[in-house]
């Protein structure tokens, strides 16, 4: 019941996904061979959200793994939980996308997409009542961004009424892997705005900062970064998988977080984050969790919520705690920081409580916020995009795969529109109600 189909694409997506399955297997007491070794009935009660039970009693993840080169997939297959996946669900090409969005979206990816869709269909048919899809990918490369967005649009066509949640790793401001990241990211955002329902925005630099500052890791590896992401991913869906007092699911999350359909890019955070050594000395209380969860340093993307305002937010608490205390703390946050919330959406913070904490913690919380300050991410990518596109730098790699310059111009203006929309609602106040009736006709001055 309420199954979620997980899809991971590209190197980044597959590495995050592999880590995520380690976390979920751990929570449900499933060992690397797919056998259940847990102790609590609660682990099995709704295990079928993420797993299929095979005839021999093994649990197989509802996961589709795709990439345009075999490398990363081989390392997933030989990794700790590599044997748990269905062998047919590994779909890969041989050529690679070479960090080129056009290869992932139009040429190489388009050749592979049908075999991916076959696997997706097969998995979806195995579901009793499919809730939606979650996609892990990065926006800077070729496969995750190009082929990832292609798959999202194809799934959108075939399953228009199912939720589409993405965990998208944006290019970082200072750390860059490839020079064409701004192109790939802008072309991807153009697709995500139209075809995804909810995008959790992540970025390596913010994750590095958390590892470095909060977790006191001197040399964080991608494994550490991906562990943070997977904690958040597991938190977002814990209400579907374990009983709770105040439940939420992907659709409730969307209804509560998205006031305007295009503005569905969320910041995420997780608490408690403590360095490995000092874990056991920390007393966890709901106020402490709440404080850390709302802390700007805790956000997993390089945008500062203090530079904008929250349209909406949602907090998912896990563990044995009083619902009353959770509600009081959330109201408290809103009252103390009222200037950071838009006043024209009353009660814009939703909380949910799930009784089962993550492994090794007594309580934890996941934060998802829709803040106008996320425009900082888009602005930054857009500036980098424009400075290259103005000179038509590296463009031949894309036009050579059959793309047209028009597509770049469209993607650029779509991203700039998105930024303006966020800015417009950031500046809006509740006494301006009358002004919005005729906004379509009048050009706005502040754009």
Swiss-Prot record:
Annotated region described as Disordered, given as residue ranges: 419-447
Organism superkingdom: Eukaryota
GO biological process, one term: microtubule cytoskeleton organization
InterPro entries in the cross-refs: Beta-tubulin_BS, Beta_tubulin, Tub_FtsZ_C, Tubulin, Tubulin/FtsZ-like_C, Tubulin/FtsZ_2-layer-sand-dom, Tubulin/FtsZ_GTPase_sf, Tubulin_C
Residue numbers binding Mg(2+): 69
Subcellular location: Cytoplasm, Cytoskeleton
Positions annotated to bind GTP: 11, 69, 138, 142-144, 204, 226
Compositional bias per record (Acidic residues), positions renumbered to this chain: 429-447
One Pfam family hit: Tubulin
Gene3D superfamilies noted in UniProt: Helix hairpin bin, Tubulin/FtsZ, C-terminal domain, Tubulin/FtsZ, GTPase domain
Ranges annotated as biased composition (Polar residues): 419-428
Alphabetical list of PROSITE patterns matching this protein: TUBULIN, TUBULIN_B_AUTOREG
GO molecular function, one term: structural constituent of cytoskeleton
Keyword annotations from UniProtKB, A to Z: Cytoplasm, Cytoskeleton, GTP-binding, Magnesium, Metal-binding, Microtubule, Nucleotide-binding
The protein's role, per its UniProt record: Tubulin is the major constituent of microtubules, a cylinder consisting of laterally associated linear protofilaments composed of alpha- and beta-tubulin heterodimers. Microtubules grow by the addition of GTP-tubulin dimers to the microtubule end, where a stabilizing cap forms. Below the cap, tubulin dimers are in GDP-bound state, owing to GTPase activity of alpha-tubulin.
Subunit text: Dimer of alpha and beta chains. A typical microtubule is a hollow water-filled tube with an outer diameter of 25 nm and an inner diameter of 15 nM. Alpha-beta heterodimers associate head-to-tail to form protofilaments running lengthwise along the microtubule wall with the beta-tubulin subunit facing the microtubule plus end conferring a structural polarity. Microtubules usually have 13 protofilaments but different protofilament numbers can be found in some organisms and specialized cells.
Protein name: Tubulin beta-2 chain
Organism: Triticum aestivum
Gene that this sequence comes from: TUBB2
């Amino acid at each position: 019941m309420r199954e979620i189909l997980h899809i991971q694409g590209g190197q980044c997506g597959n590495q995050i996904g592999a880590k995520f399955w380690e976390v979920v297997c751990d929570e449900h007491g499933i060992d690397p061979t797919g056998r259940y070794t847990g102790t609590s009935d609660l682990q099995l009660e709704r295990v079928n959200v993420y797993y299929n039970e095979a005839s021999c009693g093994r649990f197989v993840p509802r996961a589709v793994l795709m990439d345009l080169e075999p490398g990363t997939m081989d390392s997933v297959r030989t990794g700790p939980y590599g044997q748990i996946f269905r062998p047919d669900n590994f779909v890969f090409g041989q050529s690679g996308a070479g960090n080129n969005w056009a290869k992932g979206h139009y040429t190489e990816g388009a050749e592979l997409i049908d075999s991916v869709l076959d696997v997706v269909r097969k998995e979806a048919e195995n579901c009793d009542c499919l809730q939606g899809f979650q996609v892990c990918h990065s926006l800077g490369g070729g496969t995750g961004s190009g082929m990832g967005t292609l798959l999202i649009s194809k799934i959108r066509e075939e399953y228009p009424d199912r939720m589409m949640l993405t965990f998208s790793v944006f290019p970082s401001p200072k750390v860059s892997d490839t020079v064409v990241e701004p192109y790939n990211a802008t072309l991807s955002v153009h697709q995500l705005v139209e075809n995804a329902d909810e995008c959790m925005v992540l970025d390596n630099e913010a994750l590095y900062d958390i590892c470095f500052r909060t977790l006191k890791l001197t040399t964080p590896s991608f494994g550490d970064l991906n562990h943070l992401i997977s904690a958040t991913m597991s938190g977002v869906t814990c209400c579907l998988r374990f009983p709770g007092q105040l439940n939420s699911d992907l659709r409730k999350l969307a209804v509560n977080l998205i006031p305007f359909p295009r503005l569905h890019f969320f910041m995420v955070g997780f608490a408690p984050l403590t360095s490995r050594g000092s874990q056991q000395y920390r007393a966890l209380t709901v106020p402490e969790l709440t404080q850390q969860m709302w802390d700007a340093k805790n956000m997993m993307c390089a945008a500062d919520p203090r530079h904008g305002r929250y349209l909406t937010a949602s907090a998912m608490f896990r563990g044995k705690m009083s619902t009353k205390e959770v509600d009081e703390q959330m109201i408290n946050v809103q009252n103390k920081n009222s200037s950071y919330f838009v006043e024209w959406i009353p009660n814009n913070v939703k909380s949910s409580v799930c009784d089962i904490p993550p492994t090794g913690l007594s309580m934890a919380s996941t934060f998802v916020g829709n803040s106008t300050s996320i425009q900082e991410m888009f602005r930054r990518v857009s500036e980098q995009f424009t400075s290259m596109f103005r000179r038509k730098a590296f463009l031949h790699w894309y036009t050579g795969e059959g793309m047209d310059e028009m597509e770049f111009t469209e993607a650029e203006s779509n991203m700039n529109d998105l930024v303006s929309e966020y800015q417009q609602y950031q500046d809006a106040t509740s006494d301006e109600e009358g002004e919005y009736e005729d906004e379509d006709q009048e050009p706005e001055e502040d754009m």
